[in-house]
């Protein structure tokens, strides 16, 4: 269910339906802690267009990206995660986190502007795909 809360231990995640990538795509707002500091992650569940020139699916993707961008902003998200490691930089960020020294910034913490930018770019990709349809 859209907006469903899922409690895992001491943390509660909020799940949102964000169809587009697939009809059942779910994106999540996740409260986090890193070295005692609180953060909020926006986990975008549907990064890729895997459906060809399908107007209804691309429109759903666009609406979902636009909506989740607003949800992430309201939640104060400052960490951006993707369901594909190539799209959130995890291939380089994971080793950096493992080797991080005291006082070094967590590379996953991109700030509210970084989260907004990521979700704006995926939305703009959907809009460009729509514009390219005949």
Residue spans for each PLM region:
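Metallo-beta-lactamase
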Residues: 3-8, 12-116
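C-terminal capping/extension segments of zinc metalloprotease domains
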Residues: 113-134
């Amino acid at each position: 269910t859209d907006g469903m809360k899922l409690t895992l231990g001491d943390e509660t995640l909020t799940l949102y339906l964000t169809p587009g990538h697939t009809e059942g795509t779910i994106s999540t707002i996740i409260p986090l802690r890193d070295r005692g500091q609180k953060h909020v992650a926006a986990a975008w569940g549907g990064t890729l267009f895997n459906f060809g020139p399908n107007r209804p699916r691309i429109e759903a993707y666009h609406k979902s990206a636009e909506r989740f961008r607003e949800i992430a902003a309201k939640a104060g998200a400052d960490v951006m995660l993707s369901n594909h490691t190539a799209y959130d930089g995890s291939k380089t960020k994971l080793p950096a986190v493992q080797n991080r020294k005291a006082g070094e910034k967590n590379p996953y913490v991109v700030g509210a502007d970084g989260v907004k930018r990521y979700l704006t770019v995926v939305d703009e990709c959907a809009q460009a795909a729509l514009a390219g349809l005949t």
